[in-house]
Amino acid sequence: MRKPDKDADRLTTLDLARSGEVRDISAMELVGEMKTGWNLGNSLDATGAPGNASEVNWGNPKTTKEMIDAVYNKGFDVIRIPVTWGGHVGDAPDYKIDDEWIARVQEVVNYAYDDGAYVIINSHHEEDWRIPDNEHIDAVDEKTAAIWKQVAERFKDYGDHLIFEGLNEPRVKGSPQEWNGGTEEGRRCVDRLNKTFLDTVRATGGNNEKRLLLMTTYASSSMSNVIKDTAIPEDDHIGFSIHAYTPYAFTYNANADWELFHWDDSHDGELVSLMTNLKENYLDKDIPVIITEYGAVNKDNNDEDRAKWVSSYIEYAELLGGIPCVWWDNGYYSSGNELFGIFDRNTCTWFTDTVTDAIIENAK
């Protein structure tokens, strides 16, 4: 199957993005322009320190234009910038975002946006207050609307290369169903928050009337039953954000009793099932999907196996629907927890060319 030439109209789309124009194209067409992505993880979504000092509190250096340029120039044309807002807002009912914080977020957004990247900003690590159950939903809904109204107003003049993702892994933290699809109550609360995000952003007008907005499922799950039980709002410019560390035994699990260190095509069935599920439930209904988080941890430098896995992952994402995939990079490669890092932010070089080159080569 011949892959589309996504570079064909590159100069035109870059000019339009920088002009601040939102083109008269469908959400499927916009997402179809994207190749592959990278997450600026554990930076603007870090917590535990006052004010803007939180950005470096989890061990990553302050984000620079040089970093983002290096990632974009490598071939990652989608830059997802996870942002935690909850620790940078005032009290109810206004929940005013700190001026210094939203200015810093905008500065980092501009690093990628000015390069011509597709930039995704979201609301990340908000689980302590964003609790999707009936006891908390009214207050959560109010705070969600207040935050997104301010963010949408701040960025309303940006072109269609800026994308808003309303919720990251919305779930009841610590509950038995946290990572197993939630409850009926929890899924209905997530539906409500998706709709509140959508309505709030659209009401700010300007380019936000047609901006691509990403909904999600409970915990951003790719489980078939969760996807089928998640409402799809009526809107011509939405897509879905899904997280898929598949298969978990290879990508994430560190339990030596049943984890996978090595990869071959005998495991491809799980990837085919994942992408087929997304195609049938979203793409076949003209709803685009972006896998906004995927990746495989470094297990004793198994880079060759990770390269084989990511080659298969991206191949099936492309062949079964043209789904852009955004690697979760938390900056950690050889020390610390969850070793998803592929880019060294201290030196602006790549920890592993083996994995990185496999991503870029298969996403063409």
From Swiss-Prot:
<keyword id="KW-0136">Cellulose degradation</keyword>
<comment type="function">
    <text>Hydrolyzes both carboxymethylcellulose and xylan. Probably has a role in hydrolyzing oligosaccharides derived from cellulose, which are transported across the cell wall.</text>
</comment>
<dbReference type="Pfam" id="PF00150">
    <property type="entry name" value="Cellulase"/>
</dbReference>
<dbReference type="GO" id="GO:0008810">
    <property type="term" value="F:cellulase activity"/>
</dbReference>
<feature type="active site" description="Nucleophile">
    <location>
        <position position="293"/>
    </location>
</feature>
<dbReference type="GO" id="GO:0030245">
    <property type="term" value="P:cellulose catabolic process"/>
</dbReference>
<dbReference type="InterPro" id="IPR018087">
    <property type="entry name" value="Glyco_hydro_5_CS"/>
</dbReference>
<dbReference type="InterPro" id="IPR050386">
    <property type="entry name" value="Glycosyl_hydrolase_5"/>
</dbReference>
<feature type="active site" description="Proton donor">
    <location>
        <position position="169"/>
    </location>
</feature>
<keyword id="KW-0326">Glycosidase</keyword>
<keyword id="KW-0858">Xylan degradation</keyword>
<dbReference type="GO" id="GO:0009986">
    <property type="term" value="C:cell surface"/>
</dbReference>
<keyword id="KW-0378">Hydrolase</keyword>
<dbReference type="GO" id="GO:0005576">
    <property type="term" value="C:extracellular region"/>
</dbReference>
<dbReference type="GO" id="GO:0005737">
    <property type="term" value="C:cytoplasm"/>
</dbReference>
<dbReference type="GO" id="GO:0008422">
    <property type="term" value="F:beta-glucosidase activity"/>
</dbReference>
<dbReference type="GO" id="GO:0031176">
    <property type="term" value="F:endo-1,4-beta-xylanase activity"/>
</dbReference>
<keyword id="KW-0119">Carbohydrate metabolism</keyword>
<keyword id="KW-0963">Cytoplasm</keyword>
<dbReference type="GO" id="GO:0045493">
    <property type="term" value="P:xylan catabolic process"/>
</dbReference>
<protein>
    <recommendedName>
        <fullName>Endoglucanase A</fullName>
        <ecNumber>3.2.1.4</ecNumber>
        <ecNumber>3.2.1.8</ecNumber>
    </recommendedName>
</protein>
<dbReference type="InterPro" id="IPR017853">
    <property type="entry name" value="Glycoside_hydrolase_SF"/>
</dbReference>
<dbReference type="InterPro" id="IPR001547">
    <property type="entry name" value="Glyco_hydro_5"/>
</dbReference>
<keyword id="KW-0624">Polysaccharide degradation</keyword>
<comment type="similarity">
    <text>Belongs to the glycosyl hydrolase 5 (cellulase A) family.</text>
</comment>
